[in-house]
Amino acid sequence: MPTICFLNGIMIIMHLTNKEHNPPHIHAIYGEYEATFYIIDGELYEGGFPINEKKLVKKFVIKYSNELLEMWKTGNYYKLPPIN
């Protein structure tokens, strides 16, 4: 699973086998928490996450949704800068 970004202690990753894991999403890991977020709107898809970190991941996904969707479609993964 390529790491896309480290965001204030949150690791944002994407699975390599994206075609088997629709709808397009990213995984976020923060300490003991793991969750999946939709790329299209940044909403929590599965798992649990603290509220402030959930808001930060959503903001990140919305900002980079085009880049994340392109990675999902092509399998060409690269690191994205964190947001403030």
Predicted feature descriptions by range:
Residues 1-84:
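Basic nucleic-acid-binding interfaces
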